A protein has these predicted regions:
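Thiol-/selenol-based redox modules, centered on thioredoxin-like
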Residues: 151-159, 163-227
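Solvent-exposed coil/turn segments that connect beta secondary-structure elements
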Residues: 65, 75, 109-114, 140-142, ...
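Short active-site neighborhood of thiol/selenol oxidoreductases, capturing the structured segment around
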Residues: 59-84, 88, 106-108
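Short loop/turn microsegments at loop-to-beta-strand junctions
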Residues: 45-46, 68, 171-173
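Structural microenvironment flanking redox-active thiols in thiol-disulfide oxidoreductases
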Residues: 83-151
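N-terminal signal peptide c-region/cleavage motif recognized by signal peptidases
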Residues: 15-17
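Sec-dependent N-terminal signal peptides
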Residues: 4-13
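N-terminal "domain-start" segment that seeds a small globular fold
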Residues: 25-61, 86-87
């Protein structure tokens, strides 16, 4: 599958009648059968109050009404963190090529606030192709302890092991929070298909809309046949 085709697919999401035909309450069931690295969660996420690169306060509640895609990384990580950031940028590119652009927020949270200062946070996005229009890199707020974001990551299910050279070993997980502020899913590792996360985001964007009119074959079924 070419990247051009993926972008074209993303551009068609939530457009016209497509918006009315999504898996609805079966979204998790469908994605679970389609994507082996998907995990349905459906519970309240850990609340947080952090700071962006400019020192502005940011809470998860600020994004109520949007789908939030968040993950934990740190700038000096030599291996999986940059790959994870690249994957998030790829997914963001597909989302932002569609009408969903204003309905999804991407968040990276540093687990190493002692070393990831404002300049580091500002420089990270452009290097990995992350678009600041709906992405931000968060760190601890003034007065918070250095382990605040690590404890937050642990509340999201991560475990940390420190090796020589202050290298942090932790799992690679992409967390998804729906428009009502519920933690809906995890996509584990880097082997999941990016288009599956885009389709899942689209399902959450369209959730709780009016019931669809009957049709011979739903758009989701047609997409499943393509992959």
């Amino acid at each position: 599958m070419t990247r051009l085709f993926i972008v074209a697919l993303a551009a068609g999401l939530v457009a016209g009648p497509v918006a009315a035909h999504h898996p609805g309450h079966k979204l998790d069931e469908v994605m679970g059968s389609k994507e082996k690295y998907f995990q349905a969660i459906d519970k309240e996420p850990p609340a947080f109050s952090l700071s962006d690169a400019d020192g502005r306060p940011v809470t998860l509640a600020d994004f109520k009404g949007k789908v939030v895609v968040l993950h934990f990384i740190y700038a000096s990580c030599p291996d999986v963190c940059p790959l994870h950031a690249d994957r998030i940028a790829e997914i963001q590119g597909m989302v932002n090529a569609s009408p969903m652009k204003g309905q999804v927020q991407f968040i990276s949270i540093t687990s190493d606030p002692a070393n990831d200062g404002p300049e580091v946070l500002r420089a990270y996005g452009p290097v990995h192709g992350l678009d600041a229009v709906n992405w931000m890199f968060l760190t601890t707020a003034a007065g918070q302890s250095e382990d605040t974001t690590r404890k937050l990551a642990e509340a999201f299910g991560h475990t940390f092991t420190k090796t020589e050279g202050n290298y942090q070993v932790h799992g690679v997980v992409t967390h998804v929070v729906d428009r009502q502020g519920h933690w809906r899913a995890n996509f584990h590792g880097l082997k999941f298909a990016p288009v599956n996360l885009v389709l899942y985001i689209n399902g959450l964007v369209n959730e709780h809309q009016a019931k669809p009119a009957p049709q011979t074959k739903r758009w989701w079924d047609k997409l499943r046949e393509l992959f």
